[in-house]
């Protein structure tokens, strides 16, 4: 018997092709395509990008766009704002290499690889450094300098020095060195002692713990702490070499949202040029809503899933709902309330993702009088962490202010 399986959406997973996907889906509504899927409202995405660029320019600082949330050419172009910035951060080399078309067009001229260097990836970083005018590396351990020195000894004599951001840990306790440690002083001194090999570009701070903010004012306090930490390191560096022209790069999406004119007052006191960086802000998610730095109207993305069963009265009223989006589609990131995402479909806003298995989720309602959605109902769910949720999907359905699909974005995969 002849099979027609190649007419279904599963065929696109084997060879994700933007143009073929557009032919299949553009013009359809979200209710007309297979579930689960990931949607980005391009109008909100662009508005968020422009607002962030405006914040930076209004106070006279530069902006560096982190592309790791969406991992697409289309999203990156919106973050760059038609030449308003040419500086980016990437979390993977796949992101870096995928941006080469924009580098060759002159739209990107400054690229930071946002992890401390790994020895196994240095050959790729070196090749990338030949393409982008300014490749920046992140350093937070003396061993990384040894690795760079060893690798550079294998390169041609005319290899340019490595441009370096020293990562400062100002409370998040992921990567970075603290200003009260001897390590940071040794790192700076070592970098400055060999200018044929290293070029100290500046200091980088990321207040990941600013997601604990519950107001713009609270986020602003974290931003000031980021600036102070970067400036403390810069003051030590300039005490060794007063001629240094340093960049102080600070930001997380909550702190970047809190950039205000009062930051401008700090600029003359700093031992370097201030740069703001952020990545989640074009899309946003539940965790950003909880900071109170944005509203639901600023969230550009959601997962759409389909009700496949419901269970009236189970585990309390009104019961529970089974949808075809689980851990892989939603991620295991929880909100402070313990849920995994919130439903925004009109009529079902009281529902939230209560628990997850690999490929299905269980929804509950905060309202015991709510009506359970029936099987086949499509629900839109804002994820807790859009960066991780988006990474699960092979393509994104793009809309502009409605549920009609206007484009397809295909994200880069791998490391």
From Swiss-Prot:
Pfam assignment, any one: D-ser_dehydrat
The organism's place on the tree of life at top rank: Eukaryota
SUPFAM superfamilies: PLP-binding barrel
GO MF, one example: D-serine ammonia-lyase activity
Cystine residue pairs: none
Annotated GO CC locations: cytosol; nucleus
Signal peptide range: none
Location of N6-(pyridoxal phosphate)lysine modifications: 68
Subcellular location(s) per record: Cytoplasm; Nucleus
Keyword Metal-binding appears in the UniProt entry: yes
Class of enzymatic activity (EC top level): lyase
Residues annotated for pyridoxal 5'-phosphate binding in this entry: 204, 211, 253, 279-280
An individual GO BP term: D-serine catabolic process
EC numbers on record: 4.3.1.18
Needed co-factor(s): pyridoxal 5'-phosphate; Zn(2+)
Entry binding sites for Zn(2+): 385, 387
Keywords on record: Cytoplasm, Detoxification, Lyase, Metal-binding, Nucleus, Pyridoxal phosphate, Zinc
Subunit text: Homodimer.
Function: Catalyzes the conversion of D-serine to pyruvate and ammonia. May play a role in D-serine detoxification.
Family as reported in the entry's similarity comment: Belongs to the DSD1 family.
Name of the molecule in the record: D-serine dehydratase
Source species of the chain: Schizosaccharomyces pombe (strain 972 / ATCC 24843) (Fission yeast)
